Regions:
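A cross-domain feature marking catalytic cores of carbohydrate-active enzymes
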Residues: 26-28, 56, 60-62, 101-104, ...
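N-terminal binding-site loop/beta-alpha segment at the start of enzyme catalytic domains
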Residues: 1-57, 95, 123
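Generic hydrophobic, aliphatic-rich segments that mediate packing or membrane embedding
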Residues: 37-41, 54, 58, 77, ...
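Glycine/proline-rich, positively charged
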Residues: 65-133
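Generic detector of intrinsically disordered, low-complexity, polar/charged segments
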Residues: 28, 32, 39, 60, ...
């Protein structure tokens, strides 16, 4: 998020990568404010880690409130899941993530709809793997 200086975030990412950690797990609502963890990670990826993209496993999640209106209130609807992924990819400056998760169960959306949206993300080349956390 924005509460930690970007240079500190850079030092943390460099140190973890140098120690062999290559899985960076994010979510659309990580911050504060929401989305800032992905934005900052994307900035550092571009500035420091772009040559190492194929060595990284980058995951993100969607499922919590993110924007006003009927489809931004989180959950597992196809509209929300796919819009959230597009927004996450834009914030990180990526074409795809390695793993895209539905962050939480949504009692108002059939699991089949959420699973179908996740499968669409793979078919569209926006995620290599999917999961439910």
């Amino acid at each position: 998020g924005d509460s930690t200086p970007i240079d500190t975030q850079r030092d943390i990412l460099r140190t973890t990568f140098d120690l062999g950690i290559n899985h960076f797990d994010l979510a659309n609502n990580y911050g504060p404010p929401y989305g800032s963890a992905e934005t900052n990670f994307g900035r550092l990826l571009k500035e420091d880690f772009r040559p190492y993209r194929d060595e990284l496993l980058i995951s993100t999640k969607a499922g919590w409130d993110m924007w006003p209106g009927p489809y931004g209130s989180g959950g597992g609807s196809r509209k929300y899941v796919l819009a959230s992924l597009d927004q996450s990819l834009q914030r990180m400056g990526l074409d795809y993530v390695d793993i895209f998760y539905s962050h939480r169960f949504d009692a108002h959306t059939p699991l089949e709809e959420t699973a179908g949206a996740l499968a669409s993300a793979v078919r569209q080349g926006k995620a290599l793997y999917i999961g439910i956390s």
